[in-house]
Amino acid sequence: MKNRREFLKQSAAIAGFAWLNPLMSQFSFAGNMTMIRGNVGYYTERGGTIGCYLTKDQSVVIDTQFPEQAANMLAEIRKVNANKINLLINTHHHGDHTAGNIVFKDVVDKVVSHENCRINLEKTALAQNALDKNLLADTVVIDKASFKLAKESVECRYFGRGHTNGDIVVHFENANIAHLGDLVFNRRFPFIDVPGGASIDQWIETLEKIVKYYDKDTIFICGHANEKYPVQINKSDIRAMQNYLDKLRIYIKQQVKDGLTEEAVIAKTTIIPGAEEWTGDGVVRSIKAGFAEYKTM
């Protein structure tokens, strides 16, 4: 049973959270919509985490999962805002982040992505004869781009190759919340998209730049997490992801040096030594990506 001090402490925390997120006290969102602060939050259902900025007058959506999930997210937005969405931003081109774009076709003013994201998405759509089922960016980012809203500034910044060759970080500057897309998989084996321009070496460097660029108070949203871990993270989680990639690099290079084949390493590996928090399915993808990058070193 809670004592009075614990009760008052919890009540104060809830009150403070509501103050940071006035929308929470006015509207009833679905359980998979979480507002963090400064009218910025995220939506989870199936696929990569959707980020959002939401007021009665303006809104921003980051990534869209799949059409059904995008429609559900749009319904949440419509509880607050009936206006056109100001910005739809894609962190990268993968289908679990972009397949829902088409749902926003007639209700968004501007679609933004890195130039390589647009190239990759168009290439994939054409290969699948599905260009009409996709919504491509009309505004592309090369190094950085900023967008001004009434009460928020949104910066999209490219730090370099990582999960693909077109990953951007989207920073709500006033709220000081940054959506990382799939540059961080929180304690979950990552997809390292070699055909899409991924590089383990470059990913490690990209994460270093991110850690140094944002301040100690920045809250981060990542695209995926182990079911035991959150998608709302901090710099220590980015460092943990960086450590995973570094330990993967060390491990694969040693296996190559020892003369082991990719198949032999897959057969014997369930975790990456030095990054034991990463468990479950998916280590095979990391091994394959590692061999693609380091087998001819």
Positions of predicted regions on the chain:
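Active-site neighborhood of phospho(di)ester-bond hydrolases with catalytic His/Asp-centered motifs
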Residues: I62-T64, N86-H94, V112-H114, H179-G181, ...
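Metallo-beta-lactamase
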Residues: C117-G160, T164-N165, E173-N174, Y214
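Ligand/cofactor pocket segment of small-molecule handling proteins
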Residues: L149-T206
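Divalent-metal (often Zn2+) His-rich catalytic cores of metallo-beta-lactamase-fold enzymes
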Residues: I204-L260
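C-terminal regulatory/interaction regions
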Residues: L260-M297
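N-terminal secretory signal peptides and thylakoid transit peptides that target proteins
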Residues: M1-A18
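Active-site metal-binding motif and surrounding structural segment of the metallo-beta-lactamase
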Residues: D57, E68-V112
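Conserved beta-strand hairpin/beta-sheet module of binuclear metal-dependent hydrolase folds
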Residues: T34-E76, V170-H171, N176-D182
